[in-house]
């Protein structure tokens, strides 16, 4: 089950003929009770130990206040300055937070979902300068920043030294979680700029006056500290032979997952009476799809 409640208060103020302020706050409460299975597989795939396939429920209660501020100042009839400050959430997927685990007794691995994941919280700032002219059209220059806390990502394999940290039974100690998703303890920093141009060639003769052109370019820079776990084994011979396995935690710096550095949008269109058509093109530079830890190259 899931209960989602939200309320907000907002005000829209005009201060003189040139300045407009829109501000408010949104309060959100998200309560969930998800049910899933706890299972154990033995070395014989057709046999599970008694009581191993049990149904378990976990309740979550997330509460957030999300303020926002939007400012617009018309310097002249052709120049406008804007600012936006917002706080937003990225909620974890349902499949990532159900209270599910499945223990493979033969391989010593655990398929695990993390019900303790928290939503990612982003503080956003946007600064926009807009120029407008009847012939030029609309030209905008934007600069934006994001500061993301508790980014959700896959940290790869995890050696279990203390099962209670994951809500697992005691006998999973020294087993291995196959793919451990967690909240990044380091803040993510993202910034960039955007240039947007929109125009209509109404002043051209005859049929050419129906032409429409749009162009947009976005450049983004990001820096993320990705925690990485290297599983190391130490062999000790004296006074007795033993193998000690441990998690060695570190981090590496890279850009944000699924965030391209460059995005270009071009659109050429034509409007005539009831007809409207567009020919569009989008270019997206290379993406970072998975973290090094998720690839498990260093584990």
What are these regions (language model features)?
Residues 2-3, 60-61, 89-148, 166-201, ...:
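Outer-membrane beta-barrel signature, preferentially recognizing the C-terminal barrel domain
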